[in-house]
Amino acid sequence: MRALCNELAVYLSKAFYRHIFPVTVCDIVILAIDAAEMTSAEKHRSASATAADARLLPFVKHRLGKPYRTAHLAVTERSLYIIIRLFAHDIAHTRTERTRFHIISPFVIIVTQIVLPRLTKKHFAPYNERIDNRNMTRDMPLGDLGKGEEVMKEFMLKYGCNPNQSTSKIYMKNDAELPIKILNGRPGYINFLDAFNSWQLVKELKEATGLPAAASFKHVSPAGAAVGLPLSDTLKKIYYVDDLELTPLATAYARARGADRMSSYGDFVALSDVCDKETATMLAREVSDGVIAPGYTDEALAILKTKRKGTYNVIEIDPNYVPEEVEEKDLFGITFSQSRNNAQITEALFENRPTANKDLPEEARRDLLIALITLKYTQSNSVCYAKDGQAIGIGAGQQSRVHCTRLAGNKADIWWLRQHPQVLALPFKDSIRRPDRDNTIDVYISDDYMDVLAEGVWQQFFTEKPEPLTREEKKHWIQTLSGVSLGSDAFFPFGDNIERAHRSGVTYIAQAGGSIRDDNVIETCDKYGIAMAFTGLRLFHH
């Protein structure tokens, strides 16, 4: 039986990748077992039989006994999966598996290649209604998903973090409706982790600053976060938006994406406000997995639906949704329960300033808010450098605090070096695309610059060979960076963090405090005239 299931699964995955619900061998084998259990479900109410009965039995009773030649009336992306279930039922109930497979296999080929493209809603409305009544969200076709009209209490995913984790879904434990609509695409497990974390981040940024906010997420940590402050001509150029009209929301995303373009490649985007045409236009030309926002204008949605050949993930979230106070997480079969992190990050956290310099101007307080709110949704340990309304360097998920400070500082240095006149003037060939330019610039400003400047190599990228940036030139340029704000998700245990932060222009710091070496940290701040606030608030996130 497994060989037969594998043959059908391989065919479907090759023929209809990205066009139907992804079918795995495991799916079909499990469904075959479920179907076999159905025959005894009334007598033996096992948990698996009950689950199979609840989801499949009504439709199977309707379909069983009818010749396959009439089954095409039920064919959609949704009901194709039902047909596969019926095929699994046949396998489970016949001893002539090979014969039956040769009967059904051509049928699947015919209906998917010939019948399916020609059907309209009127052909399968009765079947869809039955399936809708069973809340079979897993079988919802992409077309219906695109309308955002379905009531969803659960959403079945292709797989979990990895393809071998085949059983995966999102759902509400209290049987409530999910606070989202899938307007386009089919987001995956990690997409949703990014979406829900990043949405909280931008929502809080908007509440804290009163400005439109955006975040660029990768692997459940932000690569960038920002609010919608105007851009200088230099920033417009290095963010590749100097040819676009920019609204405050579009500017916020330009900043979030531009902070660390190497890490933001293939990001998931969060927007605090309704996505407008200008922001959608910017999104459409970047390599990105999806976006979450409280709404989309008609023009914006039309633009986004054309991205990635129509598969771009577009999620609309209810801006008024408030989760329960207690959250749970399962690990190794053990459930963890805790109160949600409802800590409010406001300027009141900056009142305790133990350093000699106690001056925190308005711009610094704003940037410190951005840094701390960003850290609240960054995998710990984490440190964030911020300037001019945006994160410019985020160090995430490091076991060592000083390594975190170095990582984030190096990213801030790269952000600043990209604004060096010599980098701005790099003579790229017109054919070199943005991702390749980003990669080339990243190497050019590193110590490995000869990887793109060697003879026979530079000709691939440039119209003429650029002069390298020397180590001294880079050091001198970085020394011109100033007014940077730094946040940490916990206390700094040693003054070495301050030493490293100072080299990247840090003038203002907000950290929890509470280290037994706080005096050493304060002394190092005073050495460089840095103003530091003890917030008394730890922001670990796991």
Kindly label every feature range from the protein language model.
Residues 15-17, 25, 51, 66, ...:
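Intrinsic low-complexity, disordered N-terminal segments enriched in polar/charged/small residues
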Residues 20, 24, 28, 81-83, ...:
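Short, positively charged and aromatic/hydrophobic N-terminal segments
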Residues 32-42, 64:
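Residue-level detector of structural "landmarks"
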Residues 40-53, 89, 94, 525:
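Short alpha-helix boundary/capping segments
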Residues 136-349, 364-382:
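Active-site loops and adjacent core secondary-structure elements that bind or stabilize anionic groups
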Residues 208-216, 314-317, 380-387, 417-428, ...:
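Flexible, glycine/charged-enriched surface loops at secondary-structure junctions
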Residues 223-261, 392-491:
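Glycine- and Gly-Pro-enriched alpha-helical subdomains that act as flexible
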Residues 271, 287-306, 310-313, 321, ...:
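C-terminal binding/interaction regions
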